[in-house]
């Protein structure tokens, strides 16, 4: 239930009173995170808010998207509601089993960064832009964001997910 991004959620995951936005990059230079709206990093309604960046690299030894989907399905196998929710979210995200043979690229996780979005985090929000600015997309370089990356498990604990 927490994966709400494919259902037009403002952020990818909502857990407890907080949320988690996940960005992926293939870039070897910097750690770019493309932000899709003014609301995406606005923590005024849900706290805590975390931004996770996953650096992937394309490699023959990596995992394909259909393999990752199969792994996720294995995790929820035997639980009717999670199976239904995962299938619903995958379709909403544009993943269809009939197209699995088209996903030939393989990726490995090279690095992950998880940062808590707080007052000093560089971001644009509806309350921080001039009157009249109603939409914006922008990019943040996570290599240049002040503050430490925290372990994923720590963020999930703070969100009440584990």
Name the predicted role of every residue range.
Residues 13-26:
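Conserved catalytic cores of phosphodiester-cleaving nucleases, focusing on short active-site segments
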Residues 1-9, 25-162:
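Nucleic-acid endonuclease domains
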């Amino acid at each position: 239930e927490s994966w709400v991004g494919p259902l037009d959620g403002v952020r990818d995951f909502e857990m407890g009173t907080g949320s988690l936005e996940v960005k992926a990059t293939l870039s070897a230079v910097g750690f770019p995170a493309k932000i899709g709206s003014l609301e995406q990093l606005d923590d005024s309604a849900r706290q805590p808010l975390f931004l996770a960046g996953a650096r992937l690299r394309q490699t023959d030894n990596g995992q394909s998207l259909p393999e990752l989907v199969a792994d996720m399905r294995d995790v929820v196998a035997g639980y009717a509601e999670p199976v239904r929710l995962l299938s619903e979210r995958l379709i909403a995200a544009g993943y269809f089993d009939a197209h699995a043979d088209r996903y030939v690229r393989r990726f490995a996780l090279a690095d992950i960064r998880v940062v808590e979005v707080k007052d000093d985090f560089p971001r644009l929000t509806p309350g921080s832009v001039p009157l009249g600015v109603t939409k914006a997309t922008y990019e943040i370089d996570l290599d240049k964001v002040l503050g430490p990356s925290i372990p994923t498990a720590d963020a999930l604990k703070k969100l009440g997910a584990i």
